[in-house]
Amino acid sequence: MATKRLARRLGLIRRKSVTPASGNPGGSRLKQLYAYLIVVDFESTCWNDGKHHSSPEIIEFPAVLLNTATGEIESEFHAYVQPQEHPILSEFCTELTGIKQVQVDEGVPLKICLSQFCKWIHKLQQQQTISFAAGDSEPSTSEVKLCAFVTWSDWDLGVCLEYECRRKQLLKPVFLNSWIDLRATYRLFYKRKPKGLSGALQEVGIEFSGREHSGLDDSRNTALLAWKMIRDGCLMKITRSLNKVLTKKNPKILARNLGTDQVEEAATCNMSIQGPSIYQKELQSTVNAEENAQMNSVCVNSSCIKGQLQPKSNMKADLYNIRHSFPLFTTKSSTSVDQLHSPTLNPPLTMQKPSKSDQLALNDSSKSSTLNSNLVLVSTTIPSVNHVSDVEMGHTFDCLPMLAEWEDVVLLPASQAEPDTDCMPPVSDTNVSTSLNSAERSLVPEEPETLSYENFEDLQETPQNSETSKSIVYKSPHSTVYDVKGAKHPGSDASAFKLPKCKPFPFTSVHASAAYPSVLRKDPLLSGGTKRNSLSPPASPRTKRQTFTIHEEKPTSSICSPGTTSCRVSPSVLTSTVNLQEPWKTGKMTPPLCKCGRRSKRLIVSNNGPNHGKAFYCCPVGKYQQDRKCCGYFKWEQTLQKERTNGKALSHSSEGLTFSSPETSRIHDRNLSFPIKNSLRLRPSMRH
């Protein structure tokens, strides 16, 4: 006995520590930061055949709640998890963990297990008033009791659960991103390396209770070891965290990357209205009831009138101004209406206080346009035809319900003061919509959208005083259609109009080239030198269409009509500026910049699952590089393609005057996502 006492006094023999029955162990303890510790110890699938297997899956999910003040285990959570990748356990796994195949077959998937675990945590938060902290903080108070997770090594939460959630694309709870590595804490506190959990318990004089490699038994023994270390004066602190921390390196790169992200977000949510100008507010204040039905399905393909409208007289001088105003087209793209409609460009004096009908038309046109347009002379939509129909429509002043059926027309006022042709502002070059709300002005339809499919070179225009040679083709209470074959407009000296082939591509915006004057000369409104009679305008009515029509994209369709055998194309008329060979269509796309300013890396999902084979971009910095930190950038390639597609389409729609056929324009409208609804709405004649 004396020898044992001497050996214990010299520290050669350690005596097993026994907690008194009162529950108050002896020894001085530091005040802990965390009032509760949740100890977890997962068991996963394993093999010993020497073959390469996939990552392990959790098959047992245990957790125990330890009170750091009393050392008692107040609550426990336990569930068996059904593996999905390898549902059959190996013999080695069954012998090591003691888990049988029947137990995992009756278990729940990891997703449901995490949901049950979160419910258990939520119940503890309500009963014990605990909360989780990402890192070290102030000690727990009587009101809020801090809690932290404890594991034996970083494998449980840092490797096993982390990568399984990534493979199965499960949302891991945020509070599982920080934990205390008890093995590392043990090594720092006792200054020695433990030989496993059972070896560490033996070194401090605690016998292992239960079965080794049983998840619940390992969690209980780990809690006993943590309590022993707390009694010995160890202060438990967070040792590992997966929460993203902003790096302090390269602040300029971070600022530049942040600005790039903001630009991309602005491009995806284009046409965001932040605050209209004073002139727009004045127009909007008079039409509160018309704002919900102001855009049609072709609101991005034809011109609208804003500001001063062109009168019907003095067309030759106006045509001269148009020819000289095309070089003045602006190509600067913008995404904000405030930037597009500059408040410094005041409207003419004649439009400072427009009438009610003018305000309705102006408000609808200004809403749908993306750049301010002060003059519109001709429709910017090229019909998908080769010949103009040789019929003429005569209408009275109250034929607005019928005219509302036609689209893509030019709106001219019945009477208005002639402007100064020397001070004509430049024409805007964007896709704008035609306003059909003014019921008090004369509407003149120009170049219908659906015309007869014949040779376009035999275009004929009928003078106003040729009604004696006409034969009535169609007559209604509002309009009369005559056959005017053989008549020819004396003032029309335009050459043959040739249209380019329409290639099947979702974006059909093209810029006007030097041949604009020849194109505009074809318009009967500009070629005629006299003012049209508003009661009988020589126009070609288009075939009536249904109010709601679903158009399908035809990849082999072109502008050429199905009845024609040949289609002549003049590349000098319209030149396409859209690159038909998009980089992402060919499989090559420049990787975007990640958050740390580096060029991201393109990877492909190789694991089994719903995203198998998908490509994504992530930070090129590896997670295990000590000198660098990964910024955590991640984006699917499909999402990036959609963002760049929208940005490409918006840039083309704002850089030049867009010409598009009716079929491709509908495809263009369907592919673009605008914040303003481009759904089918009631026509102006049906709103009242």
UniProtKB/Swiss-Prot annotation:
Pfam family, any one: Zn_ribbon_GRF
Domain Exonuclease: 37-226
PROSITE patterns, per the entry: ZF_GRF
Binding site for AMP: E43, H213
Residue numbers spanned by region Disordered: 337-367, 523-546
Cofactor(s) this protein cannot do without: Mg(2+)
Record keywords, A-Z: Exonuclease, Hydrolase, Magnesium, Metal-binding, Nuclease, Zinc, Zinc-finger
Domain of life assignment: Eukaryota
Enzyme class: hydrolase
EC numbers, comma separated: 3.1.-.-
UniProt keyword annotation of Metal-binding present: yes
PANTHER family named among the record's database cross-references: 3'-5' EXONUCLEASE ERI1-RELATED, 3'-5' EXORIBONUCLEASE 1-RELATED
Family the UniProt entry places it in: Belongs to the ERI2 family.
Name of this protein: ERI1 exoribonuclease 2
Species of origin: Mus musculus (Mouse)
Native organism taxonomy: Eukaryota, Metazoa, Chordata, Craniata, Vertebrata
